[in-house]
UniProtKB/Swiss-Prot annotation:
One of its GO terms (biological process) is proteolysis. Keywords: Calcium, Cell adhesion impairing toxin, Disulfide bond, Fibrinogenolytic toxin, Glycoprotein, Hemorrhagic toxin, Hemostasis impairing toxin, Hydrolase, Metal-binding, Metalloprotease, Protease, Pyrrolidone carboxylic acid, Secreted, Signal, Toxin, Zinc, Zymogen. The active site is at 335. It comes from Gloydius brevicauda. It is an enzyme of class 3 (hydrolase). Monomer. Shows weak hemorrhagic activity. Rapidly degrades the alpha-chain of fibrinogen (FGA). This is Zinc metalloproteinase-disintegrin-like brevilysin H6.
Length: 610
């Protein structure tokens, strides 16, 4: 644990106000000028790092004093963070720059519970903060006086294009009635507090158009991406999700895909490139493309729904339509929200007095809040689909930055970390020291009850199927033992299926999940349609092309069900959606014949499948 530094920045009352000025965010018609003056109080003999872990800024907005507390965003970069660009002859150049002493911060405004703030302190102060419900931006003025900064409201930026901007994702709300019911649920503080964090390892990609737009200045593009990621991390922490930047890629020598104004084509091409190229050389969970191209119509973003962790479809595309990082961050958070199973908000969804991130149309003032509907949908997706790539919390030894008590991450030298003393809700943990209180054996974990290890034999993870036995506490640890499955290929459900990654996938259950009761696996003749290789009947996709099923593989393509429900008589019912082509396909590991299972669109011998 390191000594927390207190840095006071005195900002003199602005000596003048401007009526209009051109800043990085655009033409601002009303702003205040402030002069930061930094005073550092360090313990005697302490070595001052380039960028402190904690800082405090004091200044005035509209003549009223504001105290801004900032803490370095320790979760911004991953241990294996890398940057890739290309030489003029197309050679890939990848580096692993040091990122421990970076200059990107989150924080809070004193005495304003609803305040949000995301600031970079690389060359002066740049970013945004919300104060008393209004969004302000701050950035250095490019004057000979390098200490001058502009502070202005978002509403005072002159917008060149006032036309409404939209996400390209469409959906049928008539078919999503459960969301309305879910939006009416109220989570208790205890439920929210103990929701486990998830970790999204993100790669940001900039196309050749971004390079041209920024006059070939790769450092400028990278700085922009750092600021976008810092904002994303701040936005998603309220969803109990940490977004860590694991890589930046810039297509400096030319686009690696065909980037067109058609969002369907561009998203599909980017998804295929991510699967076949990016994922083979860089471990990550999600990739977002930032492009300078102007998408057709009012669309500025597009993504696949419920696709997080999918090797191909865990992607989104965002148009660089605004110079304001906060605006682009909200659009990117919106598209990543689709990847996390979140749909557009409806009239019954609420963010209190604010607009919501998942509105189909981007609001006049960008919101950094997800609605109650979004929270429910996101965690329904996480709990129901279990996207495994975002489950693993980085080990304390994997975090390259110095441990900081109070950041809610268990790091080297800490026994617990429940946040700041003001926010800590853990009765077992001393928030000031990140050590367990006297008499406590544990402060967290599925095998920790009232600060003591649970008794040996206490069930800590229930069985999800006969292929996934329950786990029990050992009595010697607060952690539940590792989740162990029966061996893949072991017969299950009275030989109707074979175990696969802890489940027993059979077609009847998959039909039930799609259509409900009274729907069963269809006759074999229905599956012959998978030989067509058309938009719905195929076994797999290769380089964007749908490959028809071989005769022996027809039961490993599109799923066909027989609907016997009242008023229905459909012997070959199937599900297909342009938004999610994979939904409705027979799941991997499903039995496709005696001693055979589906694997990569083929019906193979279970003895050799795994």
């Amino acid at each position: 644990m390191i000594q927390v530094l207190l840095v006071t920045i005195c900002l003199a009352a602005f000596p003048y106000q401007g009526s209009s000025i051109i800043l990085e965010s655009g033409n601002v018609n009303d702003y205040e000028v402030v002069y930061p003056r930094k005073v550092t109080a360090l313990p005697k003999g302490a070595v001052q790092p380039k960028y402190e872990d904690a800082m405090q800024y004091e200044f005035k907005v509209n003549g009223e004093p504001v105290v801004l507390h900032l803490g370095k965003n320790k979760q911004l970069f991953s241990k294996d963070y890398s940057e890739t660009h290309y030489s003029p002859d197309g050679r890939e150049i990848t580096t692993n720059p040091p990122v421990e002493d970076h200059c990107y911060y989150h924080g809070r405004i004193e005495n304003d519970a609803d305040s949000t703030r995301s600031i970079s302190a690389c060359n002066g102060l740049k970013g945004h903060f919300k104060l008393q419900g209004e969004t302000y931006l701050i950035e250095p003025l490019k004057l000979s006086d390098s200490e001058a900064h502009a502070v202005y409201k978002y509403e005072n930026i002159l917008k060149e294009d006032e036309a409404p901007k939209m996400c390209g994702v469409t959906q049928n709300w008539e078919s999503y009635e459960p969301i309305k019911k879910a939006s009416q649920l109220n989570l208790t503080p205890e439920q929210q507090r103990y929701n486990p964090f998830r970790f999204v390892e993100l790669v940001l990609v900039a196309d050749k158009g971004m390079v041209t737009k920024n006059n070939g200045d790769l450092n400028k593009i990278k700085t922009r991406m750092y600021e976008l990621a810092n904002n994303l991390n701040d936005i998603y922490r309220y969803m109990y999700i940490h977004v860590a930047l694991v890589g930046v890629e810039i297509w400096s020598d030319g686009d690696k895909i065909t980037v067109t104004p058609n969002v369907d084509d561009t998203l599909s091409s980017f998804a295929e490139w991510r699967k076949t190229h990016l994922l083979t050389r860089k471990k990550h969970d999600n990739a977002q493309l930032l492009t300078a191209i102007d998408f057709n119509g009012p669309t500025i973003g597009y993504a696949y729904i419920a696709s997080m962790c999918h090797p191909k479809r865990s992607v989104g595309i965002v148009q660089d339509y605004s110079p304001i990082n906060l605006v682009l961050s909200v659009v990117m958070a919106h598209e990543m929200g689709h990847n996390l199973g979140i749909h557009h908000d409806h009239s019954y969804c609420s963010c209190g007095d604010y607009a919501c991130i998942m509105g189909a149309t981007i609001s006049h003032e960008p919101s950094t809040f997800f609605s109650n509907c979004s929270y429910i949908q996101c965690w329904d997706f996480i709990m129901d689909h279990n996207p495994e790539c975002i489950v693993n919390e980085p080990l304390g030894t994997d975090i390259v930055s110095p441990p900081v008590c109070g950041n809610e991450l268990l790091e080297v030298g800490e026994e617990c970390d429940c946040g700041t003393p003001e926010n800590c809700q853990n009765e077992c943990c001393d928030a000031a020291t990140c050590k367990l209180k006297s008499g406590s054996q544990c402060g967290h974990g599925d095998c920790c009850e009232q600060c003591k290890f649970s008794k040996s034999g206490t069930e800590c993870r229930e069985s999800m199927s006969e292929c996934d036995p329950a786990e029990h506490c050992t009595g010697q640890s607060s952690e539940c033992p590792a989740d162990v499955f029966h061996k893949n290929g072991q017969p299950c459900l009275h030989n109707y299926g074979y175990c696969y990654n802890g489940n027993c996938p059979i077609m009847y259950h998959q039909c039930y999940a799609l259509w409900g009761a009274d729907v069963y696996e269809a006759e074999d003749s229905c599956f012959e349609s998978n030989k067509k290789g058309n938009y719905y009947g195929y076994c797999r996709k290769e380089n964007g092309k749908k490959i028809p099923c071989a005769p022996e593989d027809v039961k490993c393509g599109r799923l066909y069900c027989k609907d016997n429900s009242p008023g229905q008589n459909n012997p070959c019912k199937m599900f297909y959606s342009n938004e999610d082509e994979h939904k409705g396909m027979v799941l991997p590991g499903t039995k496709c014949g005696d001693g055979k299972v589906c694997s990569n669109g083929h019906c193979v011998d279970v003895a050799t499948a795994y």
